[in-house]
Amino acid sequence: MLSGYRVFSRRYVKSFPCLSRGFEIETELTIHALELRMKYGEVNTKYGERSEGSVSKLSTWSDGFKILKTIIKLYSLERPLYFFSIIGVLLAALSIILGLPIIVDYIDTGLVRRFPTAFLTASIMLSSIMAFVCGIILHSNTTTRREMKALFYLSEKNYKLIM
């Protein structure tokens, strides 16, 4: 995935919406190819030693964080239902954890003694529901976008490679 050397068909280039800049574009290139179920192959190439006196522009930590950020961003764009469902489940669990003692206290005494926590719990649960709804809406948008991308890819003329 992170080879740094790529060859693309004309169809691929015409259908690829480049959204990233820099090192993280490699992740986006791979996801685009996988999303449209494009054929891909590997070509063995010879690599040589780095010239003496030259310095690598790669930085392990900063480039790694850029790629991780891009993966999270692309995951939220490509799989919004799963992404927002995870957020919704975490928020719902937090709401239940905070709300159970209040409910138990209410059943025992008939009073809500920690009203601010009850309000916070209700707000977190509403946020959880909103995350699920956003995931459903964005999932339908993503499905439509994928279909449009696939149609655009297929509408591009496929040129034969002459060797």
Curated annotation (Swiss-Prot):
InterPro entries hit by this protein: Glycosyltransferase_2, Nucleotide-diphossugar_trans
Protein name: Uncharacterized protein SF2094/S2216
Organism per entry: Shigella flexneri
Biological classification of the source: Bacteria, Pseudomonadati, Pseudomonadota, Gammaproteobacteria, Enterobacterales
